[in-house]
């Protein structure tokens, strides 16, 4: 993308379209455009004009998209097909990083660490980009270029795009871009824009790159009749789509309907087949899979498109947050039309209608939005109806793409650290002491986490359980193949870390207050750095109460450490177990029963809570009974994470990505989302 130039309008005779195609190929550029493949209009590399869908249309409706031969000479008389430009800017499959040997020294063998794999592709021209699809590119730019990190592969691919837009001449039965304010008019962010007439194309120039693509074609200026005919064609398309959906207040209406019975009704039809997310031009969720050579010498991580409709999308070691189809459909619809707004400043839907046409059971999001979140009747008589005018765009404006050498937010590099010590905490929990002098790793805050990677296994998120001047500790339960591999590391082994990531505990809010630290099982690990921080500043904290629950006495973490703290009297330590034998002389019961015995001034108490979410919800109920408000109750959440920086989409909870906006939140921030099952 480059700066726009003064608009100029030309006319391209139909027989000269081949010449324009040749110009688009100049400089080794690959041209991507619509063509007929597998019984549909797909986006593929185009070498010749006869590969374009000349004389073909599409008859589409909910659950239906059929090619229709029109026996004419028009090229772009179809609504969008199932493939989108996302396939070329954000490929369905690519190698994210490969394991390489670090610099070897005489003193030690070279440790292995992940290294990003740069994008390799020719510059591209996109021919036939609709207005809604330009909006989709803007939306993806916002997600992948303006987040906490820049997706370097996406940035490289977008930087070399030449956009040849096409204004729609027909509206499909599933199109609703007028409702989303994204079309059918092509308003900007193009290099060239074509409006197809029977004998040729009205051509608008949007950038210097677009003007350069027309050099040598000696095109005449478009006549007033030609420009009027082009405008009338787009106006007919707008009229064909009918009355726009009532979008005012939709995000709030959707979130207020989180427990509507309509979700279960939709789930009776929804197959959770993922078609809607795969054809969507803005969905960005991905998963990382590990690949390993048979000889063990090579390993890499492959990023693939994923979908919030898959069963394992929200699975973590302790269970699955969205087992029901209704929860997965709710996640998709509320994200697209609701929580995308606070996350990225726009809707996640551009109204292309692909999800409706390519749903095998014909679920129509337009109908479901009206059923789940009907518009609120106005309190007074509405004002007189004004003349129809184009709806304002609800997508972000064009973005300046980073140059290859631009400094800016990017994923943290992987750092190789050495295992200095290995300590068993319980039968299935190990604490690893890791040595490093990397200032980034050592600068973490209590409550942050790292991504830990070994060749050929997934890189799980792991909370830091202690920071040292010369390293850090990770306390890990062997809950799956990845954590089992990390737990089995021995002294002298190495592991790659990226981080620390996320938002930690608000330690500054504890000063001058009574503090309750309430946790269960391995949930003590992310709270341990918080305890370290408060103990180092003990004179600034009023009272510190630790309530710790475990399944059995043998499942407690840091036993000797907690016993020393309890004996010192520096903090009040209360431990309880769910069940125990006669050798256990302590409390038996759930941790919420311990909270009732804590003596504190609740009008100045702050609570930090970590554990299974059902345990945390029960704890919150008890804290509320004691008068502690949501603003002073802080929790840390567990969610599936493949990236740690808000790009994979797995960890979404309402308006938040747990990895980058959390994992620590106050109850006031989470609001009702904390209590809704399956969200």
List the predicted regions and their residue ranges.
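Short, flexible loop segments at boundaries between secondary-structure elements
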Residues: 154-169, 551, 629-650
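A broadly conserved sequence feature marking short terminus-proximal activation segments
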Residues: 225-250, 278, 294-325, 575, ...
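Intrinsically disordered, low-complexity proline-rich tandem-repeat tracts
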Residues: 378-399
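Ferredoxin-reductase
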Residues: 404-496, 550-552, 579
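Ferredoxin-type iron-sulfur electron-transfer modules in oxidoreductases and energy-metabolism complexes
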Residues: 247-268, 286-382, 623-626, 667, ...
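Iron-sulfur-associated redox domains of electron-transfer enzymes in respiratory
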Residues: 2-255, 263, 535, 543-556, ...
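FNR/FR-type flavoprotein reductase catalytic core
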Residues: 481-642
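Local cysteine-cluster metal-coordination motifs and their immediate loop/turn environment
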Residues: 130-135, 268-287, 303-316, 345-362, ...
């Amino acid at each position: 993308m480059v700066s726009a130039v003064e608009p100029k309008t030309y006319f391209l005779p139909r027989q000269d379209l081949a010449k324009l195609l040749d110009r688009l190929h100049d400089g080794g550029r690959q041209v991507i455009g619509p063509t007929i493949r597998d019984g549909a209009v797909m986006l593929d590399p185009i070498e010749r004009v006869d590969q374009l869908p000349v004389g073909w249309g599409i008859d589409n409706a909910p659950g239906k998209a059929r090619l229709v031969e029109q026996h004419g000479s028009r090229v772009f008389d179809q609504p969008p097909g199932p493939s989108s430009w996302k396939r070329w800017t954000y490929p369905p499959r690519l190698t994210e990083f490969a394991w390489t040997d670090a610099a070897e020294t005489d003193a030690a063998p070279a440790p292995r660490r992940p290294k990003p794999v740069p994008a390799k592709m020719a510059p591209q021209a996109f021919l036939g980009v609709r207005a809604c699809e330009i909006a989709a590119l803007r939306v993806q730019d916002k997600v992948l270029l303006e987040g906490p990190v820049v997706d370097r592969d996406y940035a490289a691919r977008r930087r070399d795009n030449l956009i040849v837009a096409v204004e729609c001449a027909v509206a499909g039965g599933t199109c609703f871009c007028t409702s989303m304010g994204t079309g059918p008019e092509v308003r900007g962010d193009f290099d060239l824009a074509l409006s197809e007439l029977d004998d040729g194309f009205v051509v608008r120039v949007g950038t210097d790159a677009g003007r350069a693509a027309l050099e040598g074609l000696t095109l005449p200026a478009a006549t007033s009749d030609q420009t009027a005919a082009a405008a009338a064609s787009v106006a007919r398309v707008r009229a064909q789509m009918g009355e726009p959906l009532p979008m005012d207040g939709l995000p709030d209406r959707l979130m207020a309907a989180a427990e509507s019975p309509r979700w279960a009704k939709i789930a009776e039809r929804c197959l959770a087949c993922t078609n809607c997310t795969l054809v969507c031009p803005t969905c960005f969720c991905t998963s990382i899979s590990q690949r390993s050579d048979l000889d063990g010498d090579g390993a890499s991580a492959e990023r693939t498109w994923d979908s919030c409709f898959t069963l394992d999308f929200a699975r973590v070691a302790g269970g699955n947050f969205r087992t029901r189809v209704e929860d997965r459909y709710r996640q998709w619809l509320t994200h697209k039309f609701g929580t995308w707004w606070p996350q990225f400043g726009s809707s996640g839907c551009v109204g292309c209608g692909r999800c409706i046409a390519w749903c095998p059971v014909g679920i129509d999001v337009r109908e479901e939005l009206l059923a789940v979140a009907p518009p609120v009747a106005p309190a007074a008589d509405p004002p007189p109806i004004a003349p129809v005018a184009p709806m304002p765009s609800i997508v972000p404006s064009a973005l300046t793409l980073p140059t290859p050498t631009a400094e800016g937010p990017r994923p943290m590099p992987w750092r190789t650290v050495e295992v200095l010590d290995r300590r068993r905490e319980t039968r299935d929990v190990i604490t690893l002491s890791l040595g490093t002098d990397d200032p980034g790793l050592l600068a973490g805050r209590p409550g942050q986490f790292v991504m830990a990677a070994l060749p050929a296994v997934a890189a799980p998120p792991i909370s830091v359980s202690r920071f040292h001047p010369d390293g850090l500790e990770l306390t890990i339960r062997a809950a799956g193949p990845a954590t089992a591999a990390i737990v089995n590391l021995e002294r002298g082994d190495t592991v790659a870390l990226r981080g620390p990531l996320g938002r930690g505990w608000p330690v500054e809010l504890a000063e001058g207050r009574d503090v309750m630290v309430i946790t269960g099982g391995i949930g003590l690990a992310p709270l341990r750095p918080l305890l370290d921080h408060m103990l180092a500043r003990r004179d600034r904290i009023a009272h510190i109460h630790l309530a710790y629950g475990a399944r059995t006495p043998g499942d407690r973490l840091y036993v000797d450490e907690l016993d020393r703290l309890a004996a010192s009297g520096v903090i009040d330590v209360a431990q309880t177990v769910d069940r125990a034998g006669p050798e256990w002389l302590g409390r038996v019961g759930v941790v919420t029963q311990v909270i009732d015995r804590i003596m504190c001034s609740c009008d100045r108490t702050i609570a930090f809570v970590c554990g299974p979410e059902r345990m945390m919800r029960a704890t919150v109920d008890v804290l509320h009974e004691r008068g502690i408000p949501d603003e002073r109750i802080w929790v840390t959440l567990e969610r599936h994470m493949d990236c740690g920086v808000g790009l994979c989409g797995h960890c979404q909870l309402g308006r938040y990505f747990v990895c980058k906006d959390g994992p620590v939140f106050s109850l006031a921030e989470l609001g009702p989302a904390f209590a809704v099952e399956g969200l």
